[in-house]
Amino acid sequence: MKIEHLSDHNVSQMNCYVFDTNIWLYIYGPMAGIQARKQRNYSNLLREILDHNAGLFITSLILSEYINRFLRICFDQWKSSNKLYNADYKSDYRPTPEFANSLSDVKAQVHDILSSCTARMPDDFHSMDIDSLVDSISQQADYNDIYLVRRCERKGFWFVSDDTDIESIPSGSLQLLKE
């Protein structure tokens, strides 16, 4: 695994990138502003990628994770601000105007994310060694992390992530870009 830090990386038109869900959350999510330095650095990387016409790919898995995580963060904030610590996501939160607002926000953000990406990466589920992926799941790395690492390895793409678990995944050819 090749690990490079943002400060040492030069974006090139020849490079292709995949942003992990946590990167999109720093840039667009409801926690944006909480870690302003990371938000700024990853937003700058996004701008550089777009300015250099480098490839920026996204998968359906990342979009699904983004939508679900965004809405769960909003749910947690709603529970806390309303002191409804035992509230249920589906029966208590979904019928609320707050959920409707969060849903509207996340849909708009997904459109922004998709417009930033140059292509949608097919998942190639039919050609992946799923047994090997499942066998690789550990206390440090979940299925989604391993799956995205393998996809980036196969394509030779830079994987941009702020998830320290990624480094625990055995990899010979992954190009990991982080803050």
Q: What label would you give each PLM region?
A:
Residues 23, 62, 147-148, 165-166:
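Alpha-helix capping/helix-boundary segments
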Residues 1-62, 69-88, 155:
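Short, well-structured N-terminal submotif of metal-dependent ribonuclease cores
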